[in-house]
Amino acid sequence: MKPTSLLLAATVLMSTPITSALAASATPPDVAKKPHVVKAPHGAERNDEYYWLRDDKRENKEMLAYLNAENAYTDAVMAPLKPLEDKLYDEVVARIKQDDASVPYRERGWWYYARFVTGKDYPVHARRKDGPGVDAVSIQAANAAGDFAGEQVLLDVNALGAGKDYYNVGDYEVSQDNRLLAYADDTNGRRQYTIRFKNLDTGELLPDTVTNAEPNLVWSDDGRTLFYVDKDPETLLSKRVKAHVLGTPASQDALVYEEEDDSFYMGIGRSRDDKFICISVESTVSSEMRCTPAASPGVFTVLAPRERDVEYQADHLGDRWVIRTNADGATNFKIVTAPTDSTSRKDWKDWVAHRDDVFVEGFELFDGFSVVAERANALESLRVIKADGSSDYVKADESAYSMGLSANPETGTDWLRYSYTSMTTPATTYEINTKTGERRQLKQQPVPGYDASKYVTERVWAPARDGKTKIPVTLVYRKDVARDGKAPMLQYAYGSYGASMDPNFSITNVSLLDRGVVYALAHIRGGQEMGRAWYDDGKLYNKINTFTDFIDVTDYLVKEGYAAKDRVAAMGGSAGGLLMGAVSNMAPEKYKVILTLVPFVDVVTTMLDPTIPLTTNEYDEWGNPEEKGYYDYILTYSPYDNLQAKAYPAMFVGTGLWDSQVQYWEPAKYVARLRDLNTGKGPVVFRTNMEAGHGGKSGRFRQYRERAEMFAFMLDQLGVASK
């Protein structure tokens, strides 16, 4: 089938991309080469002529001048595409119900929700008192009508962020007596949060502040003490749990627990029944929990001592602990139980058995039933286990989708709330009665002008080069796009840390689909879509599989006619940016343009430096290059080290000056060396957000503006431009 006239009217094929023509005549910034040798403990040495671009304080004038010059060059190259960028941005904003609100949930006698104000970037967090006739449906109706009588505003993030280039509230927590609020905010994207306090009875901000913290907060039962996670100011590792007593200086906060092993990170939370406050410490391959009674916090007692290659996460309800673990060879995890006062491994009793073909992702406990989040064949499912031991699965409506637990703070209910979405179905919140099976839709993300019937999503399986592995791929495209090998395609993947990339609806992607672009989400190894073995096959000495899987998916989709071989774009960020750098080195001819955001591209140098944030947490993900074997293996794929004098695709590289996860100098060095070696004609542009961190700019509209610029660059390179 040929594209309809509507689609053709929105598509123009150009022989030479505007950005390529302009980049050929423009001159990118000069960047000095300065000799520097990076040494490894085992004696290996590497030259890094752009190492000088690193400045931990972000103050070096020569470095800042270079980043600003790169931004100016990007502005110049992108200037002719400003009308397209504006059009893309306007299209996305038009798909937003700007005064939308979340589905309220009830907790301790109050209904909590977030709502947006038309034209504003940030949410308003609010609550309403429970009472006769007050429920999620009535509150949604009131919010939609602009009726905020009886609402108590917890945080107006627009007011808090006013005048700031960057602002983010990472977490907030209401005290058990509902009177006090603690919240954590970040003003530069570095993820070093400041904790602040508010009296909800008076609306007064209290003078107490705690700096350099994680957005992870737990109140004691008496509402006088807040437990929080303190960060190391240099490595940004979550190192200590402290207790702040209101009305006292933060310098006097008591040390509750300190983790000595830098390969672990930590968090703190309450058990499901609020009886315990628990500290969780985890590495890539091990975990340990320590808990204390919430009513009288004291010594945090270890549930089960840490063991290498044994992970567990526990929760408590009633008279037992319920524990998800991979102990005893349960590669895909199982669920066990233990008595409240006997939690060592010898006391664990199997409850949900391990299965080779089903990955147990998590669980939620209720008084009359339990829910297990599972994954099989790269699809999520929710299994409801009833008190009598029987079980049912929550039904999905499509063949490729995403399903997960939603807010369920109360245990004494028969109703389970969950979320559902797909690449064609906007985010939807349902609740299902676990006794009767009745399902109610509480909300679907409103998308003005969107017609789901015009699009199709499907799941295909691409063969990997090993001849035995099948890689799941989720596709979405307009129904009037022919599978004739002529369409442009954007292929996205991540493939690290066991993070599963599930198919979600995207209002920004609709603008691509309406221009005839096929969108492909590749569920490659290194993620956990197919279970723990899928992750293990894409890390450490198996990391190369992540990159070859991505390339093999591209080859398959082109072979099957989903895309033209010369009109393929690739996109990834962070560890997915490592993926982009690797595939551009391994198979540059297969990609017309690559979009790489906050890319982790200098793996060896970063992993050799324990002072860089996250390095020590990740030795079991990439390997420790202080060991010669890992050093040599990482060198085979590290993007910065494998750049060569050859033709590379056009590339859009983005970073944030204050990025805490991938330091800005990695993409800066990468772009400098790439430009020096690249023999291709495609432009390389480098955008640094000078006020942003790993997640980009804050605020919903500014993020859409960033995406519009990047997509305008990509569409131009693919030969697609809007009239």
UniProtKB/Swiss-Prot annotation:
<keyword id="KW-0720">Serine protease</keyword>
<dbReference type="GO" id="GO:0008239">
    <property type="term" value="F:dipeptidyl-peptidase activity"/>
</dbReference>
<protein>
    <recommendedName>
        <fullName>Dipeptidyl aminopeptidase BI</fullName>
        <ecNumber>3.4.14.-</ecNumber>
    </recommendedName>
</protein>
<feature type="active site" description="Charge relay system">
    <location>
        <position position="659"/>
    </location>
</feature>
<dbReference type="Pfam" id="PF02897">
    <property type="entry name" value="Peptidase_S9_N"/>
</dbReference>
<keyword id="KW-0378">Hydrolase</keyword>
<dbReference type="InterPro" id="IPR023302">
    <property type="entry name" value="Pept_S9A_N"/>
</dbReference>
<dbReference type="InterPro" id="IPR029058">
    <property type="entry name" value="AB_hydrolase_fold"/>
</dbReference>
<dbReference type="GO" id="GO:0051603">
    <property type="term" value="P:proteolysis involved in protein catabolic process"/>
</dbReference>
<dbReference type="GO" id="GO:0004177">
    <property type="term" value="F:aminopeptidase activity"/>
</dbReference>
<keyword id="KW-0645">Protease</keyword>
<feature type="active site" description="Charge relay system">
    <location>
        <position position="574"/>
    </location>
</feature>
<comment type="similarity">
    <text>Belongs to the peptidase S9A family.</text>
</comment>
<keyword id="KW-0031">Aminopeptidase</keyword>
<dbReference type="GO" id="GO:0004252">
    <property type="term" value="F:serine-type endopeptidase activity"/>
</dbReference>
<dbReference type="Pfam" id="PF00326">
    <property type="entry name" value="Peptidase_S9"/>
</dbReference>
<feature type="active site" description="Charge relay system">
    <location>
        <position position="694"/>
    </location>
</feature>
<feature type="signal peptide">
    <location>
        <begin position="1"/>
        <end position="23"/>
    </location>
</feature>
<dbReference type="InterPro" id="IPR001375">
    <property type="entry name" value="Peptidase_S9_cat"/>
</dbReference>
<dbReference type="InterPro" id="IPR002470">
    <property type="entry name" value="Peptidase_S9A"/>
</dbReference>
<keyword id="KW-0732">Signal</keyword>
<dbReference type="InterPro" id="IPR051543">
    <property type="entry name" value="Serine_Peptidase_S9A"/>
</dbReference>
<comment type="function">
    <text>Sequentially removes dipeptide units (NH3-P2-P1-) from the amino termini of peptides and proteins. Is able to catalyze the removal of Asp-Arg from the amino termini of angiotensins I and II. Has slight endopeptidase activity on N-terminally blocked peptide derivatives which contain arginine residues at the P1 position. Does not hydrolyze Ala-Ala-Ala and Ala-Ala-Ala-Ala substrates or insulin beta chain.</text>
</comment>
<comment type="subunit">
    <text>Monomer.</text>
</comment>
